[in-house]
């Protein structure tokens, strides 16, 4: 993984209120919420070691990578061909209509194996308020909850999570035709 990939190696997903940058190797390395000009939650784009990130990628990332959007959408598809197989990571942020559009923002990430068998790894390391605010982790079998001053985030989905300090990680092996989704929600 390139510690500081060029902006050209990123895709943009958003929900009309804020946006996230997704590197071509499956790392969300910039996300601010609840608005574009809010303090960051993930900022590895600026500080790889301390800025925080959300990784969903094959365990062995060697190979060819390409990003594209589903036609006429803001749904980003990151495709890869590796020695283990061919897979995709699909990223998007659902749009919430109405007056509560800024109350909750979701990063939806789907890992899918097209051919072969691929082990996907996940690492969620939020660093709230430009990494200036400490957070506390509550981990249950259903979800991980990150508590920071003035912010709460939840991570849940089809990939089993385990504690890694105040962060979480996980992994899941997918065979051809299988998919697993995770959702990061800012409240």
Show which residues each predicted segment covers.
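Beta-sandwich/jelly-roll carbohydrate-recognition scaffolds of carbohydrate-active enzymes
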Residues: 3-187
């Amino acid at each position: 993984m390139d510690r500081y990939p060029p902006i050209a190696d990123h895709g943009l997903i958003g929900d009309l209120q804020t946006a996230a940058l997704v590197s071509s190797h499956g790392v969300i390395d910039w996300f601010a919420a609840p608005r574009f000009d809010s303090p960051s939650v993930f900022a590895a784009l600026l500080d790889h070691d301390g800025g925080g990130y959300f990784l969903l990628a094959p365990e062995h990332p060697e190979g060819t990578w390409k990003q594209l959007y589903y036609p006429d959408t803001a749904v980003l598809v990151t495709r890869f061909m590796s020695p283990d197989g061919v897979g995709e990571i699909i990223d998007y942020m659902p749009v919430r209509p109405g007056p509560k559009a800024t109350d909750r923002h979701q990063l939806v990430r789907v890992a899918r194996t097209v051919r072969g068998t691929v082990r996907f790894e996940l690492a969620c390391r939020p660093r709230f308020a430009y990494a200036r605010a400490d957070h506390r982790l509550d981990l249950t079998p259903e979800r991980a909850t990150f508590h920071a001053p003035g912010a709460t985030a939840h991570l849940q989905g089809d990939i089993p999570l385990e504690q890694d300090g105040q962060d979480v990680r996980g992994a899941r092996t997918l065979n051809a035709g299988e998919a697993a989704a995770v959702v990061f929600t800012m409240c």
